Amino acid sequence: ESNLTTIAELWGVYLERHVDPSDVAVMMTMLKIARIKLNPKNSDNWIDGCGYLSLGAELIVDKPEPEPPVKFQGGKT
């Protein structure tokens, strides 16, 4: 994740807009798809594309949505 975060920060500076690490995972996957289109017999592009998708999935799994707050129902403590 830290590599995707670093790339996101650098791309964000260059593009002058916020880039999320998950954006990096998607765009790197698209880069690999473009390379597959040019040379579908290079297995490294297929493998790397899967790797970037996997890294993107890890970003989602590592950030579970917060639980909604539980409203106090009263009673004695």
Spans of features found by a protein language model:
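Intrinsically disordered, low-complexity regulatory regions
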Residues: 1-77
